[in-house]
Amino acid sequence: MQSNIELVITDEKVQTRIIADKNILSENFPYFKAMFMYTEGQADYVCLHTQNVQVAHDLIVSCGNTSYKFQDKTWDYIFDLYKCRNFFGLDFIPLVDNTVPPEYIDKLIDTMEIIGYDYSTIKYIAHNLPKDYALNKLSIELLKSIQQILSEFYFLVENRNGLSMFDGVSKMCLKLFEFDFYSVEQMSYCYLNQTNRLVILDTNNILKIFDVQTLNVVAISSGNCFCNSIIYLESKNCIVGINSGGFEIYDAINLKLIGKINGPKQFDYVETSLIGKSSDDKYIIFQQAVETDYGYHYQLMIALVETGEIIGPIYNDKKEFSCICSPTQNIIIYGNYNNFTLWSLDSRSVIAELRLNVDPFKFVFIGFSLDGCYIIFVDSNAIAYIWSIVTKQFIRSNSTISMRNHKNPTYACNSYRQFNKEKFGLNNISILPNNNLVSTKGNCISIWNIMCQEPIESFNLPIDSFMSKIQVITNKRDLANKIRNFINS
């Protein structure tokens, strides 16, 4: 077989020619490997008709090398490149880090359909699909596949060795970031769930964005970020950091400082910590610990991201309290021991008060289900209580929760699930996308159906369990819930 061959590449408008080595083509492209096994193996030239001559030329010249930089190419070029790679028998691999703009989503879906739907192409659609996309344009089969991918989750493990991410299904580990043991408490980070990136505020007060697949640093803040914690607002694509003076807002792509919100100044000595955000990213919820002559006084505060208005304190206590934010509604629940209040951020009023008449009066976990329909309480005896947002009742209980204007609140004394305490870890409890509950004991992870006493799955992660913090990372919750509701409607 002759070594060289002339490739005559044409599309509807232009033509180009490439002199290439058959052996190199066969090694890098399954299409040419199969071609040269037949009569074309003895040919001097071959004619190829493609959709885009320039794209085919670049792909052949680069020998299909995915390290070639495509960041400066147009989206039309990128989509033609995906089709061309598929034509030459190459696997689908996302070639750019940027999120596909909304105006190109239909073309993205058409391109993936031409390539063929499999896990990699559907995952690419799922990670780029806007939450306001018209779902009736997609088939139910495709929506179910997207929903399944959006239900995937990861374990983000923080310990004295650094940060590691584990796939929730395969349990495969990806080492992300290493830092000194003594700086653990100074680290703050948040996960950008639509781009598969991690933002870290390091001990030098510098923000960095890491691609969790390549481990590359894709952006660094130009100045210092003097914040003690950060959070990601997906709908605004920005990072919000908090400190005693207020808030700093950074662009989530290039980490440029784009705004500030001044905090309340009525106290001289105050520690401010971030709690969370509302489901629509309009509100930031934070706690202030005010130092007095008699110790600390704890306050629950709200900030409006758009206007910078500070609301509160909406709750005061001499003891530390818990507060969590609903993933789907603009409501929060706060309190301590066995007294909790459900509060609306939009109406700025109490929705309901919960009294859990249980012993001991100590809860190690309070969380919303990811569909926002239930609140789950777990106490130090591994007993779980589930309260419905819709019915304002504990599951399997006839006792409704009283509203604030009711004189005699009712209690949840017979509505509980008792987990196997020998297997149930009281640290790092989280809710999974399927509303199962995950707990850790040492480096053993157990996944529980909330109605069952025994775990449905247990496995060990290869981690140093000393001082480990494990966080469950999920994909686009809003879009996953929207697809679920659309399919069920």
From Swiss-Prot:
Taxonomic superkingdom: Viruses
Domain BTB positions: 3-73
InterPro entries (alphabetical): Quinoprotein_ADH-like_sf, WD40/YVTN_repeat-like_dom_sf
Family designation: Belongs to the mimivirus BTB/WD family.
Name this polypeptide is given: Putative BTB/POZ domain-containing protein R773
